């Protein structure tokens, strides 16, 4: 593993679940079904360790607002108890390619949003996933938030390298 590799947070282990080695995870990944697929490698980062612990996903299921994961070789509550409070991460090399028009959250967060007319709206501070399409929360220069739906009629161009998003606001969108 490269020492200088960038790591991306995909979840936080907040507790154990049951006695068979499952952990409760608050997910921070864009694609939980993909990221937590059986056989995938994840890395556990604990404050007390100098190196991450590599684990292999044995099972994944959703329970209430949590993702429940179990790992190969960690079969009891005693095995996973030390992981409480730890972060689950993946190296940048594991992110994989996306289809055209798809972006990882970290590519969109902190992008500057500008209208086609050149008016700067603000920076994307978070992404909501309420249903049919994502909604980008943009912090305006006056401190208020604008909600920008990620749909073709509004988002004209995304340039993650330059951290610029060009939009065509619908009537009333920015009021």
UniProtKB/Swiss-Prot annotation:
GO molecular function: ribosome binding
Pfam families: PRC, RimM
Main location as per UniProt: cytoplasm
Residues covered by the PRC barrel domain: 100-173
The UniProt record lists the keyword Metal-binding: no
Keyword annotations: Chaperone, Cytoplasm, Ribosome biogenesis, rRNA processing
UniProt-listed GO biological process terms: ribosomal small subunit biogenesis; rRNA processing
UniProt GO cellular component terms: cytoplasm; ribosome
Domain of life: Bacteria
Keyword hit for Cytoplasm: yes
InterPro entries the record matches: PRC-brl_dom (IPR027275), PRC_barrel-like_sf (IPR011033), RimM (IPR011961), RimM_N (IPR002676), RimM_N_sf (IPR036976), Transl_B-barrel_sf (IPR009000)
Localization of this protein: Cytoplasm
Family statement drawn from the similarity comment of this UniProt entry: Belongs to the RimM family.
Role, per record: An accessory protein needed during the final step in the assembly of 30S ribosomal subunit, possibly for assembly of the head region. Essential for efficient processing of 16S rRNA. May be needed both before and after RbfA during the maturation of 16S rRNA. It has affinity for free ribosomal 30S subunits but not for 70S ribosomes.
Free-text note regarding domains: The PRC barrel domain binds ribosomal protein uS19.
Assembly, per entry: Binds ribosomal protein uS19.
Record PANTHER family: RIBOSOME MATURATION FACTOR RIMM
Protein's name according to its UniProt entry: Ribosome maturation factor RimM
Organism of origin: Geobacillus thermodenitrificans (strain NG80-2)
UniProt gene name: rimM
């Amino acid at each position: 593993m490269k020492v200088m590799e960038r790591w991306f947070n995909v979840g936080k282990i907040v507790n154990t679940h049951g006695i068979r080695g499952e952990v409760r995870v608050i997910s921070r990944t864009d694609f939980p079904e993909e990221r937590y697929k059986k056989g995938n490698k994840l890395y556990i980062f604990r404050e007390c360790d100098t190196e991450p612990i590599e684990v292999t996903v044995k099972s994944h299921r959703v329970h209430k607002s949590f993702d429940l994961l179990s790992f190969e070789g960690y079969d009891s509550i005693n095995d996973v108890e030390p992981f409480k409070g730890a972060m689950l991460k993946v190296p940048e090399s594991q992110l994989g390619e996306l289809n055209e028009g798809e972006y990882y959250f970290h590519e969109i967060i902190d992008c500057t949003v500008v209208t086609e007319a050149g008016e700067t709206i603000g920076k994307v501070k978070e992404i909501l996933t309420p249903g049919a399409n994502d909604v980008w929360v943009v912090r305006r220069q006056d401190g208020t938030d604008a909600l920008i739906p990620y749909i073709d009629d509004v988002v004209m161009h995304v340039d993650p390298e330059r951290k610029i998003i060009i939009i065509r606001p619908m009537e009333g969108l920015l009021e």
